[in-house]
Amino acid sequence: MQLPASAFTAVDWDAIVPTLHPGETGQAEWRTLNVGDMRLRRVDYSPGYLADHWCDRGHVIFVLEGELTSELKDGRTTTLTAGMSYHVSDFGDPAHRSSTSVGAKLFIVD
């Protein structure tokens, strides 16, 4: 990963105003910080959230709280709990989408 030039920066994620993103069911709240071409996010998924799209973008995703299920278009599923992560490159595998039955808080770099 090539990180863009950036000064040392502490971030208070609770101070960033969230944007709401409805899913097919439930919703996601994104708190976003853009640093050059890198996007940092703290994302909160409501219980019952299902993404409204399939994604081919690369990510590093770390589960802070709750439980996240990632489904790949080829039928594979992976469930992550707090303290677990996954990473995938742009177009690195079949497209994926996220869901959660209980809600989840994530830290995402893409």
Regions found by a protein language model. Give the residues of each.
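Conserved short histidine dyad/triad with adjacent acidic residue
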Residues: 36-55, 89-92
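Short, conserved beta-strand element in jelly-roll/cupin
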Residues: 45, 54-70
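A short, N-terminal "cap"/entry segment at the start of jelly-roll beta-barrel domains
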Residues: 1-42
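Short acidic-glycine-tyrosine-enriched beta hairpin
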Residues: 74-91
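Short beta-strand segments in beta-sandwich/barrel cores
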Residues: 50, 67-71, 85
